[in-house]
A protein has these predicted regions:
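Charged DNA-binding/catalytic regions of mobile-element recombinases
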Residues: 1-212
Length: 212
């Protein structure tokens, strides 16, 4: 991290007032993504590991894979597959990850080949990877803690539906109540008189939009 901050034009001096890590995230938000695993236990006592990437600027989530055995080789291949799905001019320069054994040197090499520098978060400092940690809590609160997961097929279906809801419809305070995929920053020119609603994830979440 002490090599990354100067490259971004930020003084990492220890006696500097304020949080240099927070300054780095703010100044480089559009170039920063974070990666982590969310663990999901099923009713049949199986544990699945959901690998995901989240964009710091938009909070957009990209699921990268689900497995019961997240080895280093599997995680590296999942990262390779995800990078192939991203737009060629994605603009990401930094990826924040923790020190889990699944994030091997081969994982970092795949990122380097795509022009992305891996930054290892400080041990026992969840705030260093706050975007990923926050999404795991949101996923649990809005989905996993409110339903029973039986198997991988059900988990994949629910996760796909929830991520679509999260990216396209869930408002965020940091984005002035806009969803990650919402790029429209204009405000309505007239009052909204009627609202339509649709439920997702078996009725666990609601989506609202102005009626035609």
């Amino acid at each position: 991290m002490w090599k990354i901050l100067p490259a971004a034009g930020i003084d990492p001096a220890r006696d500097r007032t304020g949080s240099t890590w927070a300054e780095f995230i703010r100044s480089q938000a559009t170039a920063v993504i974070a990666v982590d695993f969310a663990c999901v236990d099923t009713a049949l006592l199986a544990r699945f590991h959901v690998l995901f990437v989240i964009e710091a600027a938009t909070r957009r989530v990209h699921p990268a894979g689900i497995t019961t055995n997240p080895t280093g080789a599997w995680t590296t291949q999942a990262a390779r597959n995800l990078l192939m799905r991203l737009p060629e001019e994605h603009g990401f320069r930094f990826l924040v990850r923790d020190g889990a054994g699944q994030f091997t040197a081969a994982f970092d090499t795949v990122l380097t080949a795509a022009g992305i520098t891996a930054i290892r978060a400080t041990a026992r400092s969840p705030q260093a990877n706050a975007f990923a940690e926050r999404w795991v809590r949101t996923l649990r609160h809005e989905l996993l803690d409110r339903t029973i997961i039986w198997n991988e097929r059900q988990l994949r279906a629910l996760l796909a539906e929830y991520v679509d809801h999260y990216n396209r419809h869930r408002p965020h305070r940091s984005r002035e109540q806009r969803a990650p995929d919402d790029v429209d920053t204009t405000t309505p020119t007239r009052p909204i008189e009627r609202i339509q609603r649709r439920t997702t994830c078996g009725g666990l979440n609601n989506e609202y939009w102005p009626a035609a």
